[in-house]
Amino acid sequence: MANIDLSQYGITGTTGILHNPSYKTLFEEETKEGLTGYEQGQVSELGAVNVKTGIFTGRSPKDKFIVDDETSHDTVWWDSEDYHNDNHRATPETWNALKEIAKKELSNKKLYVVDAFCGANKDTRMAVRFIVEVAWQAHFVTNMFIQPTEEELANFKPDFVVYNASKAKVENYKELGLHSETAVVFNLTSREQVIINTWYGGEMKKGMFSMMNYFLPLKGIAAMHCSANTDKQGQNTAIFFGLSGTGKTTLSTDPKRLLIGDDEHGWDDEGVFNFEGGCYAKVINLDMESEPDIYGAIKRNALLENVTLDDKGNIDFADKTITENTRVSYPIDHIKGTVKGFVNDKSAAPAAKSVIFLSADAFGVLPPVSILTPEQTKYYFLSGFTAKLAGTERGITEPTPTFSACFGQAFLELHPTKYAEELVKKMEANGTKAYLVNTGWNGSGKRISIKDTRGIIDAIHSGAIKKAPTKKIPFFNLEVPTELEGVDTNILDPKDTYANPADWEAKAKDLAQRFIKNFDKYTKNNEAGKALVAAGPQL
């Protein structure tokens, strides 16, 4: 039991505190006899413990609030009629009431306190203290954040405190101006987060990502929802942006290269660095052959979420009974081939040479690869486009577009143009090139092959794409290579994949119109946004 005083936070009468417990202790605590409900962990055949998170098997965006005070009022990108997002306003009075609920829930209990860092660079990292009453929640943040050394722990002074009161409820939520009995609320002045009535671990992970997304760009550091890797010498860094289903994880996990991280990164004057100390991978339909790295990472100390196990601990990765969003969190050293431990002692590498935007275009319009200008980089970054095929009631499959600012709108606390400015500033200072890669469909009706996409990514890493002959395609005015080693030449111009080129033109005009309509929101009262219209599609 630790010698740590929580009365400074208004938490009193604790019956015991486990401070940064070891994995062995966490395993014992989350599987011990007598635990019931969602506190109870079940040991799987692979050694990892599986837990259930109740009705919340993902984040609850409608229940995310930020205290509207002098710190946040003029800086936060608030939810508005013009542009809906997840940054809902809470009053200081509501904050005080919610913190009281959390303090009451956490008082007179045995608690777990985990002190950890968010950010691999010492100058800009955030020291976070997590106060929780559930053992597996302590395990989750131990996996996902960067663990301090013994010396760092002895001198730990938190920059941010998270109170996880998942067992409590906000019964008077209506009078507090909330949407439900659940609340995930941030106070940027006191640097605290309160979580009430949701057990989902990702609220702590993405909560701290949102805070890095607030504080870092204000210091001139790019904060990014992306994966990143580098070559075996740790010098040729690449960043991959992309929404779910675009191949971000698949393409950044490359046996020829070293992984920096799979989800959250910053870019400062030293280079690109991971915010996290672990990975949080989807495991629905996980297969040992196709994703050996993730499968191999599921062992003791990994934590499975909402996966179906039988009485003997056998895992059914195909079972969606609880959710399709089944997950595993594990420390990054469960993966072979990472920068940390291979090139240096942290998940970081020099400035990126390539920035890759991944879009799975189900309209069949975008080229497999386009070379972007700085203005186009900002435009397509702010657009954050992908599309998926959705079946309609008549069995016709129609593309559904998704536009998510900066490929991570849910986690942006500042206006999207701020993230675009910081990214392009870093790119211009380092001579970084940006590419738009379509991992979706073309006129053949088939998805662009993973072989061709990997050939494109290899040509970007090697620099071969910079020497390739190019041409411009109409409406989008994108520069595309006309030949590229290891890639089928016939697919490089999407128009060539259509039996009738007029079909591509009709679809291109339709998609261009969707981009234009989506971008309109950036032009309202925003000169930076207006200036970028010319970089987008023109009709």
UniProtKB/Swiss-Prot annotation:
First-listed, main subcellular location of the protein, grouped into a coarse class: cytoplasm
Any Gene Ontology CC annotation: cytosol
CDD domains for the chain: PEPCK_ATP
Pathway noted in the entry: Carbohydrate biosynthesis; gluconeogenesis
Entry-linked InterPro entries: PEP_carboxykinase_ATP, PEP_carboxykinase_C, PEP_carboxykinase_N, PEPCK_ATP_CS
Known EC number: 4.1.1.49
Subcellular location: Cytoplasm
Keywords, sorted A to Z: ATP-binding, Cytoplasm, Decarboxylase, Gluconeogenesis, Lyase, Manganese, Metal-binding, Nucleotide-binding
Catalyzed reactions: oxaloacetate + ATP = phosphoenolpyruvate + ADP + CO2
Residues bound to substrate: R59, Y200, K206, R327
Record has DNA-binding as a keyword: no
Binding of Mn(2+), residues: K206, H225, D263
Top EC class of this enzyme: lyase
Signal sequence interval, chain numbering: none
Cofactor dependence: Mn(2+)
Domain of life: Bacteria
GO terms classed as biological process: gluconeogenesis
Alphabetized GO MF terms: ATP binding; metal ion binding; phosphoenolpyruvate carboxykinase (ATP) activity
Positions contributing to ATP binding: 206, 225, 242-250, 291, 327, 447-448, 453
Annotated cofactor note: Binds 1 Mn(2+) ion per subunit.
Function: Involved in the gluconeogenesis. Catalyzes the conversion of oxaloacetate (OAA) to phosphoenolpyruvate (PEP) through direct phosphoryl transfer between the nucleoside triphosphate and OAA.
HAMAP family: PEPCK_ATP
Family: Belongs to the phosphoenolpyruvate carboxykinase (ATP) family.
NCBIfam families: pckA (TIGR00224), PRK09344.1-1 (NF006819), PRK09344.1-2 (NF006820), PRK09344.1-3 (NF006821)
Protein name from the UniProt record: Phosphoenolpyruvate carboxykinase (ATP)
Source species of the chain: Selenomonas ruminantium
Encoding gene (name): pckA
